[in-house]
Amino acid sequence: MGGLRLLAVALTCSCWWPQGGQGKTLRGSFSSAAARDAQGQSIGHFEFHGDHALLCVRINNVAVAVGKEAKLYLFQAQEWLKLLESSPGYSCSERLARAQLTVTVTQTEHNLTVSQLPAPQTWRVFYADKFTCRDDSESPQGEEIPFEMVLLNPDAEGNPLDHFSARESGLHEFFFLLVLVYFVTACIYAQSLWQAMKKGGPMHTILKVLTTALLLQAASALANYIHLSRYSRDGLGVPLIGSLAEVFDIASQIQMLYLLLSLCMGWTIVRMKKSQSRPLQWDSTPASTGIAVFIVITQSILLLWEQFEDTSHHSAHSHRSLAGLLLIVLRICLALSLGCGLYQVITVERSALKREFYITFAKGCILWFLCQPALACIAVAFNDYQRDKLITVGVILCQAVAMVILYRLFLSHSLYWEVSSLSSVTLPLTISSAHRGRPHF
């Protein structure tokens, strides 16, 4: 399956190119033409919280700003939506006049303290000047005004030094703890796992694929931590490393998807075609391989489509676009189909050992596929700024638990078969000789 691996890497790299404009230190230019075309140039948005949040804007060309009567307008996101949806609509000047906060840009640096309600709220920042609401057709003249804008929330001591918005707060600490857990776990179990893999046996290939997926998830957590550590200092982070974190995560998802599908499809198809006395194998049959490859390619295409459709670049796990909804539907369908297939295998299986094996495997599969749809439904009951964090943290933890379940399952059975010196023909899972010699995704 080397070609499948190359396809996965190509798709994930193409859809997760470094994203710009995601930091809370914003750099750009105030443009009279852009402000006039849109009746207010959108600069950015931020989830402020606390009583001492700060907006700091710096410019160099003060004379041009004064000549243009440059101003910044801050709207609460909900109020801004009401203005856009109001009927009859407000004129340009009436809309700007309803801004909750206004800053007249007349100095090199302006600091605006945002007094906030107890609950965090999203604020949108717009630029406008004397040319923005004019009715004449003459194009606005004059230079653009380069700016740097820093958006800060209060830290634990109440000082406006936190670059993280309410939507992102706590993720830095979460990824630090996650990386720490991965490191400690590796120190404890890496040697024994390596020895188990060196011994070979019927679980060898599965453990290799599962370990690769786990290493990709650990690399994603480390890249996220590095990006957020830099982000906490300058509000920009390292977009390339942040994008690599998503690449690693998606590659891990595809790796696990192919593993789970290959195992389950192989078992169910072989069960239908062979007598029940024959062992269930991870056979490289055209049917099982074709189904797995088709679903993996489908998920990869949906992930690529989602990145082009979701311009707001939310968390990779919080699917908000049409493609994201299709991904959720795909996961639900996979969980149901694999669950039904395994249920059929379990009901006709006479061996208690095999039944226990399949039941535990089914639990890991269902948890892996259904955690994201379930958390997405639960997140509806929470505030908007809490949803991305809930889904991101919940999916990572649930999938980690699913991988632990699968690791315990395969390692325990590998040890049992080794100690018992059972023939591979009697095992509930073997790998055919033709399949063993092939590289697996």
From Swiss-Prot:
GO cellular component terms given for this protein: membrane
Membrane topology, from the record: Multi-pass membrane protein
Alphabetical UniProt keywords: Glycoprotein, Membrane, Signal, Transmembrane, Transmembrane helix
Transmembrane segments: 174-194, 206-226, 250-270, 285-305, 322-342, 361-381, 390-410
Known glycosylation sites: 111
Stretch forming the signal peptide: 1-23
Subcellular compartments: Membrane
GO biological process: fat cell differentiation; G protein-coupled receptor signaling pathway; gene expression; generation of precursor metabolites and energy; lipid metabolic process; response to food; response to pheromone
Pfam families in the record: GP180_GOLD, GPR180-TMEM145_TM
InterPro entries: GPR180-like_N, GPR180/TMEM145, GPR180/TMEM145_TM
Record-given protein name: Integral membrane protein GPR180
Organism of provenance: Mus musculus (Mouse)
Gene name in the database record: Gpr180
